[in-house]
Amino acid sequence: MSGRGKQGGKARAKAKTRSSRAGLQFPVGRVHRLLRKGNYSERVGAGAPVYLAAVLEYLTAEILELAGNAARDNKKTRIIPRHLQLAIRNDEELNKLLGRVTIAQGGVLPNIQAVLLPKKTESHHKPKGK
């Protein structure tokens, strides 16, 4: 008898991803790998990829929330690049963060200079008296 049966030893615990431990949807392991392979520094701490994944997830959720609102305003159910553009450019902080970013097929914000608008005149047309 070699004693290699199933009766001895503990069962191995189910693997739990670092993303699920942190309560995130974004992949912490992939972010960690990219930080290591990107030559940003010689060593990468354990908390850095978790923090970066959380920040990326928050920014993505914020942009998608605003883009979804823009799509709904245009009576559409699918977000297109135009909705992303409208969402980012109408939000002051996101516009500052992504000011130099060009979104393909995004178009521009509708804007007419005040000088070009027709002048408002009072419409009190008095009938000519006799």
Curated annotation (Swiss-Prot):
Q: Where is the composition biased (Basic residues)?
A: 7-19
- The membrane-spanning stretches of this chain are none
PTM Symmetric dimethylarginine: list the residues.
Answer: R4
Fetch the CDD domains from UniProt: HFD_H2A
For the modification Phosphothreonine, which residues carry it?
T121
Q: Which residues carry this modification: N6-glutaryllysine?
A: K96, K119, K120, K126
Crosslink Glycyl lysine isopeptide (Lys-Gly) (interchain with G-Cter in ubiquitin): position given as K120
N6-lactoyllysine (modified residue): where?
Answer: K10
Q: Which residues carry this modification: N6-(2-hydroxyisobutyryl)lysine?
A: K6, K10, K37, K75, K76, K96, K119
**Positions where N6-crotonyllysine occurs in the chain:** K37, K119, K120, K126
According to the UniProt entry, which residues carry Citrulline?
R4
**Which family is this protein grouped under?**
Belongs to the histone H2A family.
Protein's recorded name: Histone H2A type 1-F
What is the originating organism of this protein?
Answer: Mus musculus
